Amino acid sequence: MSAPVTPTKPPTPAAPTTPAPKPAEPASAFGAYLDYGPRGVARIALLSQWLGGAQLRVAHTYLPGDRWSNIEGPPGFLDVWADWRRERKDRMLVLNVPMMERNEENVSDAEVRMLLRQGAAGAFDQHFRALAQRLVELEVPDTVIVLGWEMNGITYTHRCGPDPEAWKTYWNRIVTTMRSVPGQKFRFDFAPSRGRDAVPWTQCYPGDDTVDIVGMDSYDQPRGLSFDEEVNEPYGLQEHVDFAKAHGKPISYPEWGLFRNGDNAAYMKRMLAWMDEHKPLYNTLTDYCPHGVWQCRQNPRASQVYRSVLFGRTDPTPQPTTPVPTPVTPVPTPVPTPVPTPVPTPVPTPVPTPVPTPVPTPVVPPNCSPLDLGEWVEYWLGGKLCMRFDWWSRTR
């Protein structure tokens, strides 16, 4: 830092500071579930093109829930997703992680209850430790983990209903295990389905210490339900927002889209407006039939709404504020000292160098030998002299 300079005159009072532009609110990242494998990654750029170059900052995939070896992250499965995530710092990888194997095999409530209690006792810790280690090795330690999603329903083996207390203990154990892996920065997303379903999702909430995001899967169902009813129903969209705010958590919508009410443009318009208003950390549309709008051609009206709203969307930039003019203290303008006009130095006209007239080479007569008398003598004589060979001839 330079030394301070003592002013030579009293300092001018500081002018009022122009207000800085209001910082933009954090952008709500969005994307879509396009496929669970490499095709899902490849389609992100194509969907972006369809949306006029909109920035899709979220990639979303699911680990298979058939067996524990796949829940650990099978070799090669996550590599292409990790590659995409690492290409830009502002991207996000969202990974749905089942809490049980045989996750969609209609396991009975009694068996689910037994499995939840085993998990709560630590029987499955090693599988989640292995997954965390794999994600850290792939250099995606900040992956969003949507763990045990839609736990308030009846679809999955990792459902909460058969034993909510064991379920919450098991969730906490999984999170603690994954957080114990060095280098991790995971964010855990608690994402029930909208509405009461089989059990109120608030009964499954495992506590603020092990939840980073409060998500919600919100499809346009059941049939005949208006969007206002989806907002205001018990455990609906409004209660979700209020619950997250009360617990100091950001919200998300890992799954959403059309469903029981078909090609419902009104739902699409209202859901997009809802997310613009409440600014989730991220949202990912489920883009396959009957839910989607790009890969599913049976929803043209909703597709047009989705595309028109998100076309060309990028992160917001700060809005310029009206500049406040800064008062300027007038400073007297000094009178400049006249500077004499310089007189140009005359440039002499160059004298052309005379080119001497070429002197024709004299023709030496026959029977004659030139005499070398030197250049100066030859100059005054007008050339070389020649002595004839026959000057002594007898006939002369």
Predicted regions and their residues:
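Composition-driven, intrinsically disordered low-complexity tracts enriched in small residues
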Residues: 1-19, 321-396
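N-terminal substrate-binding region of glycoside hydrolase catalytic domains
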Residues: 20-123, 258, 284
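Substrate-binding cleft of secreted/luminal carbohydrate-active enzymes
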Residues: 22-40, 249-327, 364-396
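Hydrophobic faces of well-ordered beta-strands that scaffold small-molecule active sites
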Residues: 30-32, 57-61, 91-97, 143-147, ...
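Alpha-helical scaffolding within the catalytic cores
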Residues: 39-48, 73-83, 128-131, 194-206, ...
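Substrate-binding cleft of extracellular glycoside hydrolase catalytic domains
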Residues: 70-186
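Glycoside hydrolase catalytic-domain groove-lining segments
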Residues: 76-92, 96-98, 204-261, 303-305, ...
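Aromatic-lined carbohydrate-recognition surfaces of secreted/lumenal glycan-active proteins
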Residues: 148, 175-200, 248-262, 285-288
